[in-house]
């Protein structure tokens, strides 16, 4: 529609609501506790530095975002404590429920020894002085886990049958067959001779469809059960179940039982215990969801369903892997994996927010060797450490991620120093606007000191087990111009 003024055309401007935006009522409203927690989490995600705000200032921010909300400072404080979002000594930790042991048969790098201590548990220590930049060791995965997201592409020959790397059109057609990189039973292909050699489980997992054969080895793995489990893991985005299925298959195929011995010696904890920490921290906040995936009853039902599918892959595992051991395997995998894979020597490294090693994954291939360098000079007898979390995160972020995912509250020197600085700022008149640039410079300086010249890999937010939003909000309103 066009309005005509003095013979000229002038567009008519109209304000429209888009997406799922709902205009808040001007009447006072008492929000649900989940709404308050979700809003606080949103504030922290938008500005990580706001996580260090005291309750009064945080309450003021919530009120400024939702003027009609009837919520007191006392209620905000109570909810933060209830959901484990205030760092206190009463927060749930499970480090004392994690157990590991030393296996003498492990071949360690020449400059490294493994030691068990009462305070740190099992860890790696330097036998001699190590210079900054020295390669301490390199290793291939003990258990390789391909990308779950590519399993459908693997089945149609569009991704490598072992490493799941995407194949080009040229490599996924006749050329691979000529090079002997195709399977003569199914459509799957390998990207290289190395991957084909490493893929010792392909026939057992993909072609052994009968679990009732009289052959002793043929009934260890039921391929039809594995394909069903693979589909289920893909649908639920459940990487841990997929991973421990592959790990158990590897252990079953290892006649020396060495791999089973190594896996059982790693830091072990039940996934049930880890889930308590998730529930005590406003759900899976650190997986960008802002809420628990399921209430405990639903989660236990999911675990049981996964366990039943696991048993269909391994018909003889009913006695060898009871449900509690299944949960222990899942917890063990979750606290030891690096980029979904398990590395034997690297799994011995304990955490520090100011680590003295630089762990670098292979840039050429996920199946390639992991390399561990000295990030600074390391004295003989000094413990080797790595960072389990992104060192550029704030103190509160790091502490929460470590408590939920690994069961402890870090007390390294960097955390102590930052905690003292945080308390000093809180006891002062507050951080003024003029102090912000200097604080940012200090943060960047600390991060540079922590990570050296290595790059920071930022995680892509994912939602596990949930659906993506079907709309994208760019603004509360959009201007529509009709001409």
Swiss-Prot record:
Biological process per Gene Ontology, one example term: methylation
E.C. code: 2.1.1.-
Signal peptide feature range: none
Keyword Ion transport included in the entry's annotation: no
A Pfam short name: SET
Organism: Meyerozyma guilliermondii (strain ATCC 6260 / CBS 566 / DSM 6381 / JCM 1539 / NBRC 10279 / NRRL Y-324)
GO cellular component: chromosome; cytoplasm; nucleus
Matches recorded under SUPFAM superfamilies: SET domain
Protein name per the record: Histone-lysine N-methyltransferase SET5
GO molecular function, one term: histone H4K20 methyltransferase activity
Entry similarity comment: Belongs to the class V-like SAM-binding methyltransferase superfamily. Histone-lysine methyltransferase family. SET5 subfamily.
Family annotation (InterPro entries): SET_dom, SET_dom_sf
UniProt keywords, alphabetically: Chromosome, Cytoplasm, Methyltransferase, Nucleus, S-adenosyl-L-methionine, Transferase
The protein's role, per its UniProt record: Histone methyltransferase that monomethylates 'Lys-5', 'Lys-8' and 'Lys-12' of histone H4 (H4K5me1, H4K8me1 and H4K12me1, respectively), thereby controlling gene expression and remodeling chromatin structures.
Location(s), subcellular: Nucleus; Chromosome; Cytoplasm
SMART domains: SET
CDD domains the UniProt entry points to: SET_SMYD
SET domain ranges (all copies): 110-389
EC primary class: transferase
Catalyzed reactions: L-lysyl-[histone] + S-adenosyl-L-methionine = N(6)-methyl-L-lysyl-[histone] + S-adenosyl-L-homocysteine + H(+)
Region Disordered, residue ranges: 420-439
């Amino acid at each position: 529609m066009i309005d005509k003024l003095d013979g000229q055309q002038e567009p008519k401007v109209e304000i429209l609501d888009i997406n799922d935006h709902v205009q808040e009522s001007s009447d006072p409203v008492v929000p649900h506790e989940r709404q308050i927690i979700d809003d606080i989490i949103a504030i922290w995600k938008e500005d990580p530095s706001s996580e260090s705000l005291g309750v009064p200032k945080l309450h003021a921010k919530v009120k400024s975002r939702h003027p009609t909300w009837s919520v007191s400072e006392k209620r905000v404080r109570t909810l933060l404590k209830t959901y484990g979002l205030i760092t206190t000594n009463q927060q749930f930790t499970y480090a004392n429920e994690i157990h590991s042991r030393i296996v003498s048969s492990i071949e360690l790098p020449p400059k490294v020894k493994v030691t068990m201590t009462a305070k740190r548990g099992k860890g790696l220590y330097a036998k001699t002085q190590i210079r900054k930049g020295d390669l301490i060791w390199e290793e291939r995965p003990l258990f390789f886990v391909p990308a779950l997201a590519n399993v459908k592409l693997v089945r149609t020959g569009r991704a490598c049958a072992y490493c799941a790397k995407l194949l080009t059109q040229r490599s996924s057609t006749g050329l691979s067959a000529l090079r002997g990189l195709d399977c003569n039973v199914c459509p799957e292909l390998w990207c290289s001779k190395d991957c084909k050699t490493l893929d010792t489980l392909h026939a057992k997992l993909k072609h052994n469809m009968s679990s009732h054969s009289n052959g002793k080895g043929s009934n260890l793995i039921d391929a039809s059960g594995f394909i069903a489990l693979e589909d289920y893991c893909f649908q639920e985005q459940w990487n841990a179940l997929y991973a421990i299925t592959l790990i158990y298959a590897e252990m079953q195929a290892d006649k020396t039982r060495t791999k089973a011995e190594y896996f059982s010696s790693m830091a072990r904890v039940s996934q049930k215990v880890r889930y308590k920490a998730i529930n005590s921290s406003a759900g899976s906040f650190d997986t960008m969801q802002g809420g628990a995936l399921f209430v405990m009853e639903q989660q236990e039902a999911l675990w049981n369903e996964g366990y039943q599918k696991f048993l269909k892959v391994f018909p003889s595992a009913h006695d060898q892997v009871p449900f509690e051991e299944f949960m222990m395997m899942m917890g063990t995998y979750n606290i030891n994996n690096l980029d979904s894979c398990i590395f034997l020597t690297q799994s011995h490294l304990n955490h520090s927010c100011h680590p003295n090693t630089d762990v670098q994954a292979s840039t050429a291939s996920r199946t390639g060797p992991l390399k561990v360098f000295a990030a600074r000079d390391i004295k003989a007898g000094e413990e080797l450490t790595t960072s389990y979390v992104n060192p550029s995160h704030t103190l509160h972020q790091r502490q929460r991620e470590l408590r939920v995912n690994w069961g402890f509250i870090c007390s390294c020197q960097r955390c102590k120093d930052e905690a003292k600085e945080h308390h000093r700022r809180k006891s002062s008149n507050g951080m003024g606007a003029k102090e912000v640039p200097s604080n940012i410079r200090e943060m960047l300086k600390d991060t540079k000191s922590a990570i050296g010249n290595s790059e920071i890999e930022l995680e892509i937010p994912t939602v596990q087990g949930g659906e993506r939003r079907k709309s994208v909000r760019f603004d509360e309103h959009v201007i529509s111009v009709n001409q």
